UniProtKB/Swiss-Prot annotation:
It is found in: Cell membrane. Belongs to the proton-activated chloride channel family. Residues 1-63, 319-350 are cytoplasmic. It catalyses: chloride(in) = chloride(out). It comes from Xenopus laevis. Keywords: Cell membrane, Chloride, Chloride channel, Ion channel, Ion transport, Membrane, Transmembrane, Transmembrane helix, Transport. Chloride channel gated by pH that facilitates the entry of chloride ions into cells upon exposure to extracellular acidic pH. The gene is pacc1. Residues 85-297 are extracellular. One of its GO terms (biological process) is chloride transport. This is Proton-activated chloride channel. GO terms for molecular function: pH-gated chloride channel activity. Residues 1-51 are annotated as: Disordered. The lineage of its organism: Eukaryota, Metazoa, Chordata, Craniata, Vertebrata. Its main location: membrane. Pfam families: TMEM206.
Amino acid sequence: MEAIRKELSRSYQELNDETDPIARDPEGAQEEEQEEAASAVVPDRDSDRSNTRVHFSRTCLKNVFSVLLIFVYLLLMGVAVFLVYQTITDFRDKLKHPVMSVSYKEVNVYDAPGIALYPGKARLLSCKHHLYDHIPPLIDPGQPGENTCITQNISYTDPYTNSTVKHALIVQGPRDVRRRELVFLQFHLNETKQDFSAIDYLLFSSYDAFLKSTNRVRFMQDCESSFSSWKFSGGFRTWVKMSLVKTKEEDGSQSVEFRQETSVVNFIDRRENPDKGDQLFFVVFEWKDPYIQEIQDIITANPWSMIALLCSVFLVLFKAADFAKLSVKWMIKVRRRHLKKRTRELNHIS
């Protein structure tokens, strides 16, 4: 019995030793509990602060991005306005300054041109058509020869002076350009009081039009007013190579112009004792090439392309404006949401 009592008293003493520190220092235990609670609360507050900072940085980035989008819209609007102005300016310039278009039409046979010669006191000795650029040697220069050309004589009043009567010899020109047809004419002038001797001539587009004209005098006056005249001198053989140029005017009418290249070679006179004032004239008319040059003014400004470009520019402007409007609304919405969340956090803290 005595041994059992000693064992019970020892166990009781050990139990008292374990509970005495808590009983002796109740404030320390309370501080330990507060520290544990604080340690449990502090991580939650730190996580909230980090989340708030991340959300704030995202919001700032979104706002900056939206502002940049607005600036991009303004830049696009400026570029679009400049494009509209430049397009309208270019369209007006193209209307005022059309572009010249040159094309070439190939033909095998030309309409026979008319050759109007003004020999004055000179006399036609011969006129023949030859092919393939071949002119036979002169048999008896200065004497009348073979005349196989179709000719017409006409007299009319000079359209510039209205007082001088002009006498013209109209000759049908070459037609077959593929076989290089040419017309060779020889004139003789026995005496002259002038220091220089030459024969005038002009070219017009159609000999048939002259024949079919009801008023040939008026026709020749119009030709002299419209076409330039040239000369060929005595003592030489003048080779005239013609080319035809057709120009389409703005009113739709068509004008015809002859361009020519001439080459002159000296005539070696082998006649015995020719008269001092005796002059021989030789002239050749031939087509240069089988191409008719056609010229017309083309307005490159296309109103439909300008309208399409303007519509595209305005469509881009409207799309950009709509995008900018949505961006502003989104910025306002994000700002309001941020303010509401901040107010809620402040209320929670308070």
